[in-house]
Each structure stands twice: as structure tokens, then as C-alpha cells.
Amino acid sequence: MLLRTVILFALAAVAEIGGAWLVWQAVREGRPWWWAGLGVMALGAYGFIASLQADASFGRILAAYGGVFVAGSLVWGAVVDGYRPDRWDVIGAVVCLLGVAVIMFGPRGQGA
């Protein structure tokens, strides 16, 4: 379950962050408008990918994914746009990923 969860979160991050980046490029950076169309399709794929998580709780999955989105956005910016996260960016991303781990893998008893 851990590997599947991580893979699905990574795929969702690529789809959502990549989709948003494509729209940004079309709107803000003067790229062709069809880039925005590809971005919208990628954002739709993100919604589908997120629904493949084993946990049935929409709120839990999306809340946990939020932490992945924070860290993934910083990585995307560094790799694709040359953005250099500072130590506070990195610390914030680590805190978010710790939150993801607590939400997704914290021990839950009956009724928790």
C-alpha cells in the first residue's frame, strides 16, 4: 500500500503541477494557447489519478495530497524554472511531507 500511495501521489503531482504550469505558460509567458488546453487535460488527469488511492476518504486524500503539492511545486520550480528554494522553503516542504505521512499512515483504531 505504501508504494502504491507514493506512486499515485507522484503521478498526481506531475499531472496537477504540470497542468498548472502549462496554463501559466500560455497565460503569463506568451506560449501558444493550445498549451493551456494541454494543461486543462493534465489537470483533469490529476482528478482521475487522485481517485485511484486505496483510502475511500476524499477529504483525507486531498488533504494529504496538499502536502505533496507543496513539496512537488518547489521541486518542479527548481527543475523546470530554475527556482532555488531557500532553507525556509525546504523546511516548510519537509513539514508538509511529515503531515502527509501522519494523515496517510498514522495508526487508526476503530472509530478514529
UniProtKB/Swiss-Prot annotation:
Organism: Clavibacter michiganensis subsp. michiganensis (strain NCPPB 382)
UniProt-listed NCBIfam families: PRK02237.1
Family listed: Belongs to the UPF0060 family.
Protein name: UPF0060 membrane protein CMM_0279
Keywords: Cell membrane, Membrane, Transmembrane, Transmembrane helix
Domain of life: Bacteria
Transmembrane annotation, as ranges: 6-26, 32-52, 61-81, 87-107
Membrane topology, from the record: Multi-pass membrane protein
Lineage: Bacteria, Bacillati, Actinomycetota, Actinomycetes, Micrococcales
Record's keyword annotation contains Protease: no
Keyword Cell membrane found: yes
Cellular compartment(s): Cell membrane
InterPro entries from the UniProt entry: UPF0060
Major localization class: membrane
Pfam families from the UniProt entry: UPF0060
GO cellular component: plasma membrane
